[in-house]
Curated annotation (Swiss-Prot):
Main location: plastid
Domain (4Fe-4S ferredoxin-type) ranges: 2-31, 39-68
Protein name in UniProt: Photosystem I iron-sulfur center
Alphabetical list of Gene3D superfamilies matching this protein: 3.30.70.20
Residue positions binding [4Fe-4S] cluster 1: C11, C14, C17, C58
This protein's encoding gene: psaC
Necessary cofactors: [4Fe-4S] cluster
Note accompanying the cofactor annotation: Binds 2 [4Fe-4S] clusters. Cluster 2 is most probably the spectroscopically characterized electron acceptor FA and cluster 1 is most probably FB.
Protein function: Apoprotein for the two 4Fe-4S centers FA and FB of photosystem I (PSI); essential for photochemical activity. FB is the terminal electron acceptor of PSI, donating electrons to ferredoxin. The C-terminus interacts with PsaA/B/D and helps assemble the protein into the PSI complex. Required for binding of PsaD and PsaE to PSI. PSI is a plastocyanin-ferredoxin oxidoreductase, converting photonic excitation into a charge separation, which transfers an electron from the donor P700 chlorophyll pair to the spectroscopically characterized acceptors A0, A1, FX, FA and FB in turn.
Any GO MF annotation of the entry: oxidoreductase activity
InterPro entries in UniProt: 4Fe4S_Fe-S-bd, 4Fe4S_Fe_S_CS, PSI_iron-sulfur_center, PSI_PsaC
Enzyme class: oxidoreductase
Subunit structure: The eukaryotic PSI reaction center is composed of at least 11 subunits.
Single GO cellular component term: photosystem I
């Protein structure tokens, strides 16, 4: 069951989410949109275990990184019955 990991442009490039991830789903990539000149990226979402530690570690009030668990995604799309 794959989970969806979304990174939003409110990311400040602090690397807290990357360091919190126990399965190395996240990594930092160059980005000119913030002072740190980097943003989190989720190239390995198939390894996400859905622990949401990245969300908890995010210091922004906007939750720049969100994990949508497989069953939450299904429910929000109206596919659950």
């Amino acid at each position: 069951m794959a989970h969806s990991v979304k990174i939003y442009d409110t990311c400040i490039g602090c690397t807290q989410c990357v360091r919190a991830c126990p399965t190395d789903v996240l990594e930092m990539i160059p980005w000119e949109g913030c002072k740190a000149k980097q943003i989190a990226s989720a190239p390995r979402t198939e390894d996400c275990v859905g622990c949401k530690r990245c969300e908890s570690a995010c210091p922004t009030d906007f939750l720049s990184v969100r994990v949508y668990l497989w069953h939450e995604t299904t429910r929000s799309m109206g596919l659950a019955y």
